[in-house]
Swiss-Prot record:
Taxonomic placement: Bacteria, Pseudomonadati, Pseudomonadota, Betaproteobacteria, Nitrosomonadales
UniProt source species: Nitrosospira multiformis (strain ATCC 25196 / NCIMB 11849 / C 71)
EC number(s) from the headed UniProt entry: 2.7.7.3
SUPFAM superfamilies noted in UniProt: Nucleotidylyl transferase
Protein name, UniProt field: Phosphopantetheine adenylyltransferase
Keywords: ATP-binding, Coenzyme A biosynthesis, Cytoplasm, Magnesium, Nucleotide-binding, Nucleotidyltransferase, Transferase
Site label Transition state stabilizer, positions: 17
One Gene Ontology cellular component annotation held by this UniProt entry: cytoplasm
């Protein structure tokens, strides 16, 4: 297959995200990891920080490109001339939301398909929200994220702690 987009906020990128990128990179000639500006959420890291972290973590994948985006995903997909959106499903609750989004996206742009991938078993329970929560309470997150991310998350928490004093 040709080109796919794997969108997300990646706040931060987790081992589960990495797993899906690894698998998608084996299916497609090119995978664009699209780091969303995140209109609905207040991200912990800025979009620029998230793009930089994702690039650092995914350096071993020559057919993976990391790009920021804002606005409609389907418009970004058309700009990138991608025909597939890759989405991860961890649980039934993910499926319901993703199924609705895939249907809406197909209505907007019928030429773009959505491909659902489930993470490998050891990553099914990982979410960026849970990883941040564990880190905020001083827990060890090294099993869930790349060492670079663990370090950067620790530094970000420390800087937020200093600024809130």
């Amino acid at each position: 297959m040709d080109k796919a987009i794997y969108p997300g906020t990646f706040d931060p990128i987790t081992r589960g995200h990495e797993d899906l990128v690894r698998r998608a990179s084996g299916l497609f000639r090119e995978v664009v990891v699209a780091v969303a500006a995140s209109s609905g959420k207040k991200p912990f890291f800025t979009q620029e920080e998230r793009v930089a972290m994702v690039r650092q973590v995914l350096t071993d994948y020559p057919n993976v490109k990391v790009m920021p985006f804002s606005g409609l995903l389907m418009e970004f997909a058309q700009q990138q001339q991608a025909r597939v959106i890759v989405r991860g499903l961890r649980a039934v609750s993910d499926f319901e939301y993703e199924f609705q989004m895939a249907g809406m996206n197909r209505t907007l742009y019928p030429d773009v398909e959505t491909l659902f991938l489930t993470p490998s078993e050891q990553y099914m329970f990982i979410s960026a929200t849970i990883v941040r929560e564990i880190a905020l309470f001083g827990g060890n997150i090294e099993k869930f994220v790349h060492p670079l991310i663990s370090t950067q998350l620790g530094m970000k928490i420390a800087s937020k702690d200093k600024s809130s004093r």
